[in-house]
Amino acid sequence: MVFIIKPDMRDLMENMVGARLAAHKTADGDNVEVCYAYQDFSSVPDFYTVPSDRVKPFGTVHALLCAREFVHEPFVVINADDYYGVDAFKTIYAELSKLAESGEGTMVGYDLCNTVSEHGTVTRGVCHVNEQGMLDRVVETFHLKP
C-alpha cells in the first residue's frame, strides 16, 4: 500500500495507519507492505515549469508521478478527500482481479449528480466516452454544484 503524503506527515501516518496495516496479512498470507511517497515538485517532468509562487501540490496525476517507483502491478487510486463506501472497494477489487496481466485499466465512476455537495462547490473528474462507450478522456472540472 502506498500513501502519497507531504513529508511532514510521515510520522503521523506511520503511527496512525501504517503500523496497523503492516500487522495485517494479504490474501497470499504476506504482510501488507506499506510505502510512503512524498508529493513534492521533484517529480514534476522536466518539460513543465512549476510557477515560482506555487506552494500547493498538483492533483491526482501529480500524486501518481510521485508514487511511480512503488507501482509495479495493477493498482487503485483512492483520494483521501472523497469516500464512496465499501461497495466501491468491492467493485474495484473485482475489476482489478480481471486485469492482472492485461495491461488495461479500469475505474469506478459515479453519476455526477450523486457526487456534488449541497455545502459548496466541488472539483470532479468528468468522464467523456466515445461512440463505442469507451472512456475517451477525463476532464478535471472545477466549481461544480447541484
Where do the PLM segments sit?
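Conserved N-terminal catalytic core of the sugar/cofactor nucleotidyltransferase
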Residues: M1-N79, Y84, F89, K98
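Conserved core of the sugar-phosphate nucleotidyltransferase
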Residues: V86-P146
